């Protein structure tokens, strides 16, 4: 099996404008938390998603229950050529669904069990086949990543102040990259690189309640490295069929592929304080260890050996969020939030068309309506993306400037047993 360095091939982790948390990490598996820009995740105590952030926070939910949510994310980007690509432009606007589901069973007032399915990582890049980005150099066409976590969790309330939690995670990753074949010959053909695989990881958490109105929580999600396998397909333009035959290839060619992507570890520190009967303030600091993201090695039996190697050299990144809840009455809760999300991309030389990531500012609001055993949650967020350039990048990508934004629309239903 011959080596091709396809950081991009399982970078797949790319999004035009990168509409989620910085890099390719996602937080969007709680609608109540989205309404406050994910401030207080794991310790807010108003839905069953804590096991996805800090499993110790499960002890805040006094009744067993379940919830299901869906976040629809609009990704919009204006891409303008710069340098040797000046005067060229393309636009992009598409929607991505992010579903989630959680359930919790309170064994007694000490032991809490839970399970969840959600998407902690994943992005998409979709350049039109006739865009100047798709026609140039590496010919980035389409990149997709979907990481689904199946989570089994347990939390234990040690006393009236301290709670501890642990989550075991079964993780499935699936990725796809479509691009032009990297060759000096024009329109040589297209390359599809598809991989999928399984891995395991875990999440540890602790929460300390100073009193019923004040608490903090700290959690750590371990990194995961998974062996992914699949196929690398090269479709050769029929006009080059004779040339392809000299390399023992036909018009359509399929090869085995392997890659070992690493998904980063992260720390979450969250706090909550209730002021009087009406106001609740939340805050979160999140630290993600992106420094290991240099190159994703990948392997293929492809005899043409297209070199898609990329040097990213990402840095660790911070996220800061502040949220406010207003408890209007026993049925209605209003909330809003603000967050700053730091990009792990160090500079324009390591920003690529596959991951044109930049810093972003979150603004959001949400509302919940509770009646009896039912609760309905709605959240909206708008992300202001800082402008970013791809310029003399490590991948020798197409020089371009990105102006992007994102809108998120989310609904969730909770049922308490």
Task: Show the residue positions of the predicted features.
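Short, solvent-exposed loop/turn elements at domain surfaces
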Residues: 75-79
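Outer-membrane beta-barrel pore proteins
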Residues: 41-64, 103-107, 155
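Outer-membrane beta-barrel porins/channels
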Residues: 20-37, 41, 81-87, 95-417
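Gram-negative bacterial Sec-dependent N-terminal signal peptides
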Residues: 1-20
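A generic secondary-structure signal marking the coil-to-beta-strand transition
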Residues: 17, 32, 49, 62-68
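Short strand-turn segments of transmembrane beta-barrel domains in outer membranes
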Residues: 38-41, 65-74
